[in-house]
């Protein structure tokens, strides 16, 4: 596990605990996604390392306009600990904890071409049956897959792509 994830874990858990206590999962998701995107920009990352940038300025830079007091205090804690650069990891950990709490599996379905809603509904039903949880599907298109799809739930990857099948066939023929 990367050092960044290790360092971000307590902050992700803290953000989740605060959001759960207030019943504000969605606003915290939105705020963390905003802050993570801003902090992930290389120019902003360099600015955050500048000692001339004050803590209040950093919090103002990274906070979304609709941020509540709890979220601003949370960013202040990160700024005090010089951990604002970990916001992308904190956001990812928060989303994982939220999905667990809401009994939702987040899946990314990458296909060679755009999929119809019927196909996505079939995949969602199969994943719900397999995991026993509701499924939140995000789609992506990657023409290099040639055909089929790759389903990634974080812990489980199902490669039903033609590219993957050809790679497995090549590997078995080589041995």
UniProtKB/Swiss-Prot annotation:
Kindly state which keywords UniProt assigns to this record, in alphabetical order: ATP synthesis, Cell inner membrane, Cell membrane, CF(1), Hydrogen ion transport, Ion transport, Membrane, Transport
Q: Which SUPFAM superfamilies match?
A: N-terminal domain of the delta subunit of the F1F0-ATP synthase
What Pfam families would the database entry show?
Answer: OSCP (PF00213)
Predominant place of localization: membrane
- GO molecular function terms attached to this record: proton-transporting ATP synthase activity, rotational mechanism
Identify the domain of life: Bacteria
* Extent of the signal sequence: none
Where in the cell does this protein reside?
Answer: Cell inner membrane
Q: Which PANTHER family would you find in this protein's record?
A: ATP SYNTHASE DELTA CHAIN
Q: What is its biological role? A: F(1)F(0) ATP synthase produces ATP from ADP in the presence of a proton or sodium gradient. F-type ATPases consist of two structural domains, F(1) containing the extramembraneous catalytic core and F(0) containing the membrane proton channel, linked together by a central stalk and a peripheral stalk. During catalysis, ATP synthesis in the catalytic domain of F(1) is coupled via a rotary mechanism of the central stalk subunits to proton translocation. This protein is part of the stalk that links CF(0) to CF(1). It either transmits conformational changes from CF(0) to CF(1) or is implicated in proton conduction.
Q: What is this protein called?
A: ATP synthase subunit delta
The record lists the organism as Xanthomonas axonopodis pv. citri (strain 306)
Q: Which gene encodes it?
A: atpH
